[in-house]
Amino acid sequence: APLGILFTMFATVGVVNAFNLIDGLNGLSSYVTASVAVSLSIIAFQAGNTQVSIFLVLVVAAVLGFMVLNFPKGKIFLGDGGAYALGHLLVWSAIILINSATEVSAFAILLVFFWPVADTGLAIWRRWKLGNPTDRPDRLHFHQLAMRFLEIRFFGRDRREVANPLATLVL
């Protein structure tokens, strides 16, 4: 049990931080949050856990309400607090779901969180491999590369207000 508690704490901190790291494009973290919440809600509903399913539907509704004001111009934004809070809600909903429904595979839940976890893992590995501090930001996240590609290839650097939300939609 102590090893499981330590793993849960490590995984929770990692996933919550991952949602903050993908908050580099306007609306991306919100969109990923909505996608993950819908997926978890469906899994919870199929497993018979209607409380978690309904809670996650409410999270989706709140995020969609936020996105109305955030996308495409970014009148308001999540910031660290919002990204951490949403990641926290999702990861603990997943933990509750795994503990309440034995038929729910932890690997299925991990697949739901694939995008933020993979992007964070690749960022840490890339920084370590290049000899850079792993806790320092860089501009090599997949969403940043996609936005720069759209800017350079289609819009030009002076059209970031178009490339930023479009990159979110593409991803």
Name what the model sees in each region.
Residues 11-20:
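Single transmembrane alpha-helix segments in multi-pass membrane proteins
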Residues 1-9:
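Membrane-helix boundary/helix-loop-helix interface segments in multi-pass membrane proteins
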Residues 4, 13, 144:
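Short, contiguous clusters of charged residues that form electrostatic/catalytic patches at enzyme active sites
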Residues 16-17, 26-29:
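PRPP/pyrophosphate-binding module of the type I phosphoribosyltransferase fold
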Residues 30-171:
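Alpha-helical transmembrane segments
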